[in-house]
Amino acid sequence: MKIFKGKKVYLMDNEFSTATGIAEEEGKIIEIGNFEDLIHKYPEAEKVLSYQNDYIYPGFVEPHSHPMLTSYFLGNCTLIDFKHWDFGKYGVVPACLTRKDMLDRLKKEVSNKEKDAFLFFGYNQQHHGKITAKELDNLEDKKPVVLLYGTGHGVVMNTYAMKKFGFDLIPKDTFGCELTESGDYNGNFTETAYMPYISYLAPVLYNNENLEKGKQLYLENAKVNGIIATAEYMGGGTSGIEKEIEFYQNFSDENYPIHMSFLTNYQHVNNEFNNDNQKTFEY
């Protein structure tokens, strides 16, 4: 057994408690508390003072993936991320480290003539280079081709998709709406030209038939990576408040023991109640 001393140890309980000592045995934390109390309780334990001047925080906390939104991505999109995804018992998806890697995966997917639309997640301009509607039109011009940025804050799409989902109606002077030299849409929409309009993609992106599949992939990936906690910015931003509540009711279990925290998106809830502040507060 070892007892580690920290200047301040932050806990993840409801009171946001702090401590100064961590008791560890066989690779597992068995108790956290006052360092002096712990060394008296476990007098035979080895004292580790290497971190006595350091602040210690919980590890393996995933702060920003939006589990429900990511589950939609994983369930409905083909990955083109520059990161390697390990889904444990469901297999792995190798990284698309280069532009060629990404284009090869795009070409393979759009060759599937049975699909009505082609969604991809993980586009990264730094790794994959600039891509526009023109290049995507060359791959497929009679069905939607949509590349979601890995950040979740942007999209590239072919001309067919722009027209089908209404992105060709976004004011051209909107921040994040990229144009060609001739002043036409080039297929890239980011931030202000994308975030308020993500619901336009609902018919294909928020396909609930594949939500459970995406959820299982998300949980298995979290398990492989040792994730112990995550948070969600609640408020119906993806498919409505009630759907979010249903999704998270049985989110974790004994196979996937992930601690969930929920932060309410006040504006989304307020919109649900026609901007009635009292009803929003009561909800």
Please describe what each predicted stretch is.
Residues 281-283:
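Non-catalytic terminal/interface segments that mediate subunit docking, oligomerization
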